[in-house]
């Protein structure tokens, strides 16, 4: 038996768990059928009994798998591959799930601890508690990832860009064989490989970031959500990404960048942040990835409303300014920006294609994701209660990572860097350029 700790909230965890078991059962049946059809079970038993049996891909090919299949199986199970296959051959995917909640408030306690850590980090960064921020200090909440926002704002990349490109040329890095619309997109993509090999560079990147007011909270309090705090006043005249624009001398705004939350967890995360920073919140920005019901991978979706799949609750969003959408289109050479309602599902795997067609053609839905409704519900409630200003800007943008309506679509298929990096950084630059411009203009008009 296995004991699992569900760290998120209720249904999202259970849907993920059951979905994973279903996927395992389907794939296990395929493997078992292959072993039976090719009479490979006796060969498998013989290999397990031998002390000198071949291992890895060689053993997989003896069982009848082709070269690509053998490579993938060894990639999944690099150790004891034959033992894992034997378990699949014998097991019949009969699972019993017993869910027992020892604490009704476990997640709430974790969220409270996580929020207190954000408050403490704000104190250390600014010398003020979140409730003590003066009117000229605006807070911009960004839900994205742990790299694109800080990459665009960290001056380390401007100084070390030539060194990274030279390193890539020496190794004939595959990202150099692709044509990029923005050279810095290639730089950020290559940097991931560079940091894996040059460990000192990753430490140097973080150190330079700290010198320019970028702080990372690695302790997630069991929420799985990292946080980065960015004091824009320390980035005055620093060399940030060329497409963002300079941070003005009077800009005192801060950015609270949080890693992706999933499902209902998003509702609790954003509520706690809005309560923490209150009327200081100038904008809430969501940069996510989604499955699209039109277009292609690498496009961008700008929702006009969210539809909650479980209740079919329809929640219209404030209209995005035309300048924002046009700015995104200008940054997305070769890809499109699609507007329309988006479906918030409890899980994006094992979706019913017939129902997705229903949402596409009846509701004119452009995409499917997992957090939008939960985020927006709390933002709307906080605005109506006066916790945050009604003037706070909302920005929701998603880049397309998969196409669930395509017959041969594979939700687990990895986005190649040249597919995923350009839309990710196009959205990041658009959001950051607007945040920086608002902070600059706000202080000039103060």
Region locations from a protein language model:
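Accessory terminal and edge-of-domain segments that mediate assembly/interaction
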Residues: 1-446
């Amino acid at each position: 038996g296995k004991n699992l700790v569900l760290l998120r909230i209720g249904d999202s965890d259970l849907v993920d768990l059951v979905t994973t078991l279903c996927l395992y059962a389907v794939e296990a049946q395929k493997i078992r059928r292959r072993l039976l059809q090719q009479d490979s079970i006796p060969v498998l038993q013989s290999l397990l009994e031998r002390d000198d049996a071949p291992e890895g891909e060689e053993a997989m090919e003896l069982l009848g798998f082709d070269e690509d299949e053998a490579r993938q199986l060894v990639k999944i199970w690099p150790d004891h591959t034959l033992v894992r296959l034997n378990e699949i051959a014998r097991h019949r995917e009969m699972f019993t799930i017993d869910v027992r909640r020892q604490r009704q408030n476990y997640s709430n306690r974790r969220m409270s601890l996580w929020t207190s850590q954000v408050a403490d980090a704000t104190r250390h960064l600014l010398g003020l508690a979140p409730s003590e921020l003066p009117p000229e200090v605006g807070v911009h909440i960004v839900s994205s990832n742990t790299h694109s926002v800080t990459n665009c704002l960290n001056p380390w990349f401007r100084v070390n860009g030539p060194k990274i490109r030279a390193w890539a040329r020496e190794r004939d890095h595959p990202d150099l064989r692709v044509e990029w619309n923005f050279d810095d997109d290639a730089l950020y993509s290559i940097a991931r490989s560079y940091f894996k090999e040059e460990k000192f560079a990753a430490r140097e990147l973080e150190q330079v970031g700290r010198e320019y007011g970028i702080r990372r909270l690695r302790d997630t309090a069991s929420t799985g959500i990292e946080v980065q705090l960015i004091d824009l006043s320390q980035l005055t005249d620093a060399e940030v990404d060329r497409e963002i624009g300079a941070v003005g001398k009077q800009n005192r705004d801060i950015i609270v960048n949080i890693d992706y939350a999933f499902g209902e967890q998003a509702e609790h995360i954003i509520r706690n942040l809005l309560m923490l920073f209150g009327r200081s919140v100038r904008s809430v920005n969501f940069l996510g990835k989604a499955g699209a019901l039109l277009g292609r991978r690498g496009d961008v979706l700008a929702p006009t409303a969210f539809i909650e799949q479980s209740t079919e609750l329809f929640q219209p969003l404030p209209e995005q300014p035309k300048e924002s959408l046009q700015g995104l289109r200008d940054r997305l050479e070769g890809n499109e920006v699609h507007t329309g309602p988006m479906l918030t599902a409890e899980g994006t795997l094992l979706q019913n294609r017939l129902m997705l067609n229903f949402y596409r053609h009846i509701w004119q839905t452009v995409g499917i994701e997992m957090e939008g409704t939960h985020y927006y519900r709390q933002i709307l409630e906080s605005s109506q209660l006066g916790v945050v200003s009604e003037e706070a800007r909302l920005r929701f943008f998603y880049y397309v990572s998969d196409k669930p309506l395509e017959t041969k679509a594979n939700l687990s298929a990895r986005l190649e860097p040249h597919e995923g990096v350009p839309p990710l950084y196009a959205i990041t630059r658009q959001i950051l350029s607007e945040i920086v411009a608002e902070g600059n203009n706000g202080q000039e008009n103060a």
